[in-house]
Amino acid sequence: MPAGLAALIARAGKSRSAPPVERWNPPFCGDIDMRIAADGRWYYLGSPIGREALVRLFASVLRREEDGRFLLVTPVEKLGITVEDAPFLGVELHAEQEEAGADTGQVLTLRTNVGDVVRIGAEHPLRFEQEVGTDGLKPYVLVRGRLEALFSRPLLYQLVELFEERDVDGIRMLGVMSDGMFFPAMAVDFFPAMAVDAASEGEA
């Protein structure tokens, strides 16, 4: 294992503060055989990393560059890794209504597989992509820096149940509200059956 990562592991547990990886600018020392699979699992040298604490440690020093590369960053080295989709996976979603008098209304909070908890809104926006080959929806939330979390399949279904209709630039859209913001997912006409289901649930 590269020296910088080995030193990081040795120091693990001595500090609970998040490493300032956005401020570190060590030399790039090449790519290593580490991969984050589309299901959120981490692999090193082809084998899954079974220790959750180790995965969270590596996740804490993960950074995405402007060119899209994913790097593990320590004070002494930058190492490239492979990410098949998003680096993190959303595993738990809570929807709550703010207290009476608040302007935000519904607030969605997401927990990731590496322990991050984010409140979906202006600082942690939600976006949707169409899944290649199936036209299914893939929701992503910005967690930190340029790093996103992809919703797990069960959470996608939970999110769809919260869909409502809004006009966006003259187009009727399905999407979800959180922290005073509307995040559009698709045009109502694109998935009429889903629109009917969402409208029926909203009237119930």
Residues of each region from the PLM?
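Long, non-globular segments of proteins
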Residues: M1-A204
